A protein has these predicted regions:
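NAD(P)-dependent Rossmann-like dehydrogenase/reductase catalytic/cofactor-binding core
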Residues: 195-251
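Internal alpha-helical scaffold of NAD(P)-dependent oxidoreductase catalytic cores
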Residues: 92, 96-105, 121-157, 168-208
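Rossmann-like NAD(P)(H) cofactor-binding subdomain of soluble oxidoreductases
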Residues: 36, 44-121
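Short acidic capping loops at alpha-helix termini that bridge into adjacent secondary structure
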Residues: 16-19, 77-79, 188
Length: 251
């Protein structure tokens, strides 16, 4: 996710490349980031010093180590902290980051990997922040897709719906593509057909504002092939499987 965010920041127009500093312990990764036109360092403290917004994007079990490692070099009056790590609680972050009774402005953020292509669905939960800071962080992530302000309670649901949801959507694309091959299309052609169909469905909903079921009604004629296909999917638990998968991912 960290690499995807860097790509999104570079492609977006919120921050200039020369103002982006990335910390990574891996030399090959630092070289990759440097080739993208940003500053790369092995030092978390160096990357955090002087930044307006410090984004910590690591595995959940590394968050405490990284935060306590940069806490003493951060300016609590000038900087903001964004933590991207599923399942990490605000109470833990407050425990790790409170310094002399003061807490740095902090946000819990869950994007998805489409952030690299400026198409993320991002959830932002303010932990400690005023209205201006919330607006600034939302503007940052809106340049890399779409973001909504939510509360910590809904981050788990947001993760499975949008972050895990990327994988669920890919699984449908794979299944439909395999079906296309069985129907006689070459694999690459089938994938392209399915991707364009998905894109068209999304655009139709965005432009018209229709409920998905109303859009389905536009293409289901009585006794036609579309309703037969839909009913066969439902007989095999299509909708139920999707909902059960989402609920399982949110546990």
């Amino acid at each position: 996710m960290g690499g995807a965010m860097v790509e999104g920041l570079i492609k977006g127009d919120f921050i200039q490349n020369e103002d982006i500093c990335v910390a990574d312990p891996s030399r090959p990764m630092r070289d990759k980031f440097a080739d993208m036109g940003v500053t790369a360092t092995p030092s978390n403290q160096l990357a955090a010093q002087g930044a307006d917004i410090v984004c910590v994007v690591v595995k959940p079990w590394l968050v405490e180590q990284v935060l306590t490692g940069i806490r003493d070099v951060m300016d609590y009056d000038q900087q903001m902290l964004v933590v991207v790590a599923a399942g990490v609680k605000s109470d833990s972050i407050k425990e790790w980051m409170t310094k002399e009774g003061k807490m740095i402005p902090t946000f819990l953020v869950i994007p998805n990997i489409a952030i690299a292509q400026l198409e993320s669905m991002t959830f932002i939960a303010p932990v400690v922040a005023d209205a201006q800071q919330v607006t600034q962080v939302k503007e940052l992530f809106d340049t890399m897709g779409h973001s909504i302000i939510t509360d910590e309670q809904h981050l788990g649901a947001g993760t499975t719906l949008a972050s895990c949801g990327i994988a669920y959507a890919m699984r449908y694309i794979r299944a439909a593509s395999e079906g296309g091959v069985e129907l006689g299309f070459k694999a690459d052609d089938a994938k392209q057909i399915v991707m364009q169909t998905m894109k068209g469905a999304v655009t139709l909903l965005e432009v018209t504002g229709l409920h998905p079921e109303a859009a389905i009604d536009l293409v289901t004629t009585p006794g036609g092939v579309t309703i037969k296909g839909l009913n066969e999917m439902e007989h095999n638990g299509f909708t139920s499987s999707v909902i059960k998968g989402l609920k399982a991912g949110a546990k």
